[in-house]
């Protein structure tokens, strides 16, 4: 099961956790989100 775009993800986790395969830093909030 993968996370959709915009879902919070771990910046240190495997990129496969996101459906897009990319976990990127949020521009405002200090979190990582799926691209």
UniProtKB/Swiss-Prot annotation:
Keywords: Disulfide bond, Knottin, Protease inhibitor, Serine protease inhibitor. Pfam families: Tryp_inh (PF17983). The keyword Disulfide bond applies. Disulfide bonds join 2-19, 9-23, 18-34. The record marks 30-31 as: Reactive bond for trypsin. One of its GO terms (molecular function) is serine-type endopeptidase inhibitor activity. Coiled coil: none annotated. The presence of a 'disulfide through disulfide knot' structurally defines this protein as a knottin. Trypsin inhibitor. Belongs to the Mirabilis serine proteinase inhibitor family. This is Trypsin inhibitor 1.
């Amino acid at each position: 099961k993968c996370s959709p775009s915009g879902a919070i993800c771990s910046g240190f986790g495997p990129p496969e956790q996101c459906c897009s395969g990319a976990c990127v830093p949020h521009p405002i909030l200090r979190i990582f989100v799926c691209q």
